[in-house]
Amino acid sequence: MTTAFPPPVQSALRGSQQPFWFLGGRVRLLVSGAATTGAVSVLEFSDTRGQAPPLHVHDREDEIWSVVDGSITFVVGDDVFDLGPGEVALGPRGTAHSYVVRSATARMLVTYAPSGVEEWFVTNSSPLEEDDGTPAPFDVAAIVSAGLRFGVHVVGPPPA
């Protein structure tokens, strides 16, 4: 049996999605939940040294990180571990997690299952019109508050 994917998937897999700023990092929505009938969404994060989101919990989805370039330290529950290119880790729903970029730059693909949380990223982002490497200003409190509608709860500061 073969599965025919709708055109948005084909378009997304060609990298046609425009990057945007979110919490100081560059993000691209590669595959939306709409393209997978809600099964998964895939985003690409490109960050610089020290970039770290607050420690947080997702109520609704598991998060799978796949490091493409660079070195990233992940915190998942009580575990702390370093990943490099080609390595993968899981942040299960309901478990506090975060990361911090250790190398000069890092890039990772993040899969959310099921999808839905990608809308939080998109609706709370800033356009990346001219990429001079300077992130657009952002309001952390507003982004954190908006996350509650998507089942994302901040439970601590970013890791150091």
Question: Model-found features: residue ranges?
Answer:
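A short, N-terminal "cap"/entry segment at the start of jelly-roll beta-barrel domains
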Residues: 1-40, 133-160
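Short acidic-glycine-tyrosine-enriched beta hairpin
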Residues: 11-13, 64, 71, 78-96
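Well-ordered beta-strand scaffold positions
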Residues: 25, 79-81, 104
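Conserved short histidine dyad/triad with adjacent acidic residue
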Residues: 29-32, 43-58
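Short, charged/polar surface micro-motifs in flexible loops or helix N-caps
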Residues: 35-38, 48-51, 64, 71-73, ...
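Ligand-binding loop in jelly-roll beta-barrel domains
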Residues: 36, 73, 93-118
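Hydrophobic small-molecule pocket/channel-lining residues, especially in calycin-type beta-barrels
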Residues: 51, 59, 72, 122, ...
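A contiguous, mid-protein "functional segment" used to position or interact
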Residues: 104-148
